Amino acid sequence: LSDRFGRRPVLIISIAGATADYLLMAAAPSLLWLYIGRIFAGITGANMAVATAYVSDITPAHERAKRFGLLGAVFGIGFIAGPVIGGVLGEWNLHAPFFAAAFMNGINLIMTAVLLKESKHSNKMTEKVQEQSILKKLSYLITQPNMAPLLGIFLIITLVSQVPATLWVIYGQDRYGWSIFIAGVSLASYGICHSIAQAFAIAPMVKRFGEKNTLLCGIACDAIGLLLLSIAVEEWVPFALLPLFALGGVAVPALQAMMSRGISDERQGELQGLLSSFNSLGAIIGPVLVTSLYFMTQASAPGMVWALAAILYVITLPLLLKYRLNKYSGVP
């Protein structure tokens, strides 16, 4: 939709939907209305995909990894601050976190409507592309040179990322006896380190090593961190591994930049929408698989899930070897 009608109107509709959703949840008289609010939010929830496409529109190809990293860093900060603010407000009033979220989305909506200009590449989708079905558009993306292996890598990273997202606190409490406070500090530290790496490490790494090698470095760091965590028995080790996991966070911005190079300007929204769908799919499937495997192996091999996640990264190596820069890059 954003490729056809422009980023700005789709962003406005998406943010307006989020605002309405939180207002509805704040005033919900029953659980049914909470579900209705969540369904409505799901229908209009495209802001991250469209925002990423917008960044791709206004950024030269050789700087996209840096901008995607900054976008990820900002998202990470929100991921850390949001639960803290919600927890504090929830102690005062159970409805307050939802009203606060609606208020912040409302401010975001006003700023988007007043300050955000349409990106230069929006509305460039040709009539032929507009008439294509969704399946045909997806087929086009997947069959582009390099895109299939890069999408495979993205899906693997998405699935692997569900291991710490799902198990970090549970594993810390089971394996190391973390208190709720220590678990919270460790989770916040994990997010802060990731945000710092994405904000400040991605640009110099891409400049020095290139996007492909930066992606490889990020995967290697994350895999090593996962392997070491799988055998760690001391409670301080996860904290010591945070820099490795943080460097692992540079992989996704570099990968996004590589994929955006291989797609024409008129298809950037489709690409980011597909990646957003992969993220959603991973968030649905990942936790179920991760928790099931963890509780099956917890007694005999508590660190097996982390080791298997690291081993899963091995699949990315032959996929990455197939990558070659294609005609849309414009940059050697």
Kindly label every feature range from the protein language model.
Residues L109-L115, A307-P332:
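Multi-pass alpha-helical transporter architecture, strongest
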Residues L1-P29:
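Conserved MFS/SLC helix-loop-helix module at the cytosolic interface between two early adjacent transmembrane helices
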Residues G90-F103, S292-Y313:
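A membrane-interface helix-boundary motif in multi-pass transporters
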Residues T166-A183:
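Short amphipathic helix-loop junctions that connect adjacent transmembrane helices
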Residues K212-L255:
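C-terminal transmembrane helical hairpin of 12-TM major facilitator-type secondary transporters
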Residues K117-I153, R175:
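Juxtamembrane intracellular "pre-TM" segments in multi-pass secondary transporters
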Residues G37-G76:
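Cytoplasmic helix-loop-helix junction between adjacent transmembrane helices
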Residues L1-G6, A197-E211, Y294:
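Helix-to-loop junctions at the C-terminal end of transmembrane segments
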